[in-house]
Regions:
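Non-catalytic, polymerase-adjacent accessory regions of viral genome-replication enzymes
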Residues: 1-49, 53
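Phosphate/adenylate-binding "loop-and-lid" substructures adjacent to NTP/NAD/dNTP-binding pockets
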Residues: 38-77, 82
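Non-catalytic, peripheral interaction segments enriched in hydrophobic/basic residues
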Residues: 316-362, 369-370
Length: 433
């Protein structure tokens, strides 16, 4: 980065009540839970003028001191450990948001066109489509670089120095430094932050882009085509040999220059169909949902349809729909509606299995199926076949008793409309195996 921002009064701009007020409005819009002080959005808003005035005076007098963040563990999809988030207090979120609003317009014009994460007007879909275009241009090999604990390893001094190449007002840099070193509250004990920026704060995404912009510039200097979304970076080349060479030299740059760590076990060189990028993969020039993302969806359906409790089908579908509509909206970029159909079919099978399980005995199950229009002969042959409930859920008798149309009538969200050219593709990448 070069060309200093010719603005020496950024800090005064930050301290305007209007900036802090806009910061609060964005915090309110994003919702979120209280930090270590327990103050909620409603509590803060009740005395908004007093709180904003106090923040303004503390900033101007340099008595403002960010509180430690509250650490929260969020389970990763598929049960692969947890992701650590840091929840700042409401007042700290207001200040961080105001700083973000102030700095984002100054850094945005200089960020790479190949960077898509947490940027205005850019989305994961934009990144995936850009990756598709690069693969289709004749670069089917992917260097998939996984950064180990990226947010935890951000080097504070390097980050501040990087920001200082653009910002004249050192007071802003000092304030950001205070935020970075505010610490984390873990079981009542404050642990000071020597490195990293905890995920969960409004400012963290911008800071992460400032750090990784240095990687972007290096890749551009080398003439490499890539797509980066936060710390998820894919580099595209023409051959396996070139990919292996790029993996080695770029890893050396990341670890030597940026002081970050490459996870060699998770990083890989592969053809595009073998690489997951933001939950998608590029298969034969088209976009498909990655197998891992499909399996995670299957696992989610299982958690939403637990055994051992009485099930009201309409309530269960409402709960499932709340998740599935959002999930399917994100994955609507896939050129394979059959993938959505697969998840919808799995939802129905899980619910059929639960409906079977709710009958206390084979006798009651027979009565239920006959009542729902299944012949007595088929019912008896099915129920007394010694199949377990999961196997029964796939039988003709149970599917006749609870057909697809019945679930749709009860409110199941159907998003797999047959309107894409790849509906009949039976590639191993499209269906779960």
């Amino acid at each position: 980065m070069s060309q200093l921002i010719e603005e020496e009064r950024l800090f005064e701009d930050l301290c305007y009540a209007s900036y802090l007020r806009i910061g609060f409005e964005q915090v309110k819009e994003n919702k979120g839970k209280p930090g270590i002080d327990g103050v909620s959005i409603q509590d803060f808003e009740f005395r908004l003028e007093e709180e904003l005035s106090r923040l303004q005076q503390e900033l101007l007098n340099w008595t403002y001191k960010p509180s430690p963040v509250r650490r929260v563990e969020i389970p990763k999809p598929g049960g692969q450990g947890v992701r650590l988030l840091g929840i700042p207090t409401l007042r700290d979120r207001v200040v961080q948001t105001a700083v973000k609003l102030l700095l984002e317009p100054l850094f945005e014009p200089y960020f790479s066109l190949h960077s898509y994460g947490f940027r205005p007007g850019r989305s994961p879909h934009d990144a995936v489509q850009a990756a598709q275009n690069i693969v289709n241009s004749g670069k089917p090999y992917v260097v998939d670089i996984d950064l180990s604990k990226f947010f935890d390893r951000i080097h504070h001094d390097r980050l501040i120095a990087r920001m200082g190449q653009r910002i004249i007002d050192k007071r802003i840099l000092r304030l950001v430094g205070l935020m970075l070193r505010s610490g984390v509250m873990i079981e009542g004990v404050v642990v000071r932050s020597e490195a990293g920026t905890m995920q969960g704060g409004p400012l963290s995404p911008l800071l992460s882009n400032i750090v990784l912009d240095e990687l972007d510039k290096e890749l551009e200097k080398r003439g490499l085509e890539f797509c980066r979304f936060a710390d998820d970076c894919n580099i595209f080349v023409k051959s396996q040999k070139a990919a292996e060479r790029v993996m080695e030299t770029v890893s050396q740059f990341i670890e030597g220059k940026l002081k970050l760590k490459v996870n060699r076990d998770k990083s890989q060189v592969a053809r595009s169909e073998g690489v997951k990028f933001l939950g998608f993969t590029v298969v034969n020039g088209t976009i498909a949902i990655a197998r891992k993302a499909l399996q995670n969806a299957m696992d989610k359906v299982k958690t939403l349809t637990p055994r051992g409790t009485h099930m009201d089908i309409e309530i269960s579908l409402k709960t499932i729909n709340q998740w599935y509509v959002g999930w399917s909206n994100y994955f609507s970029l896939s050129n394979y509606p059959a993938q959505l159909h697969k998840i919808e079919a799995h939802i129905r099978r899980r619910l059929r299995s639960r409906l079977v399980d709710q009958q206390k005995s084979k006798k009651y199950l027979c009565q239920k199926l006959v009542k729902r229009g299944v012949s007595r002969r088929l019912t008896a042959r099915t129920v007394y076949s010694n199949r377990k409930r999961w196997a029964l859920s796939k039988t003709v008798a149970v599917e006749r008793a609870y057909p697809n149309a019945w679930f749709k009538q009860k409110g199941q969200a159907i998003r797999s409309d047959k309107k894409e050219a790849h509906w009949f593709d039976v590639s191993k990448w499209v269906y779960l195996t």
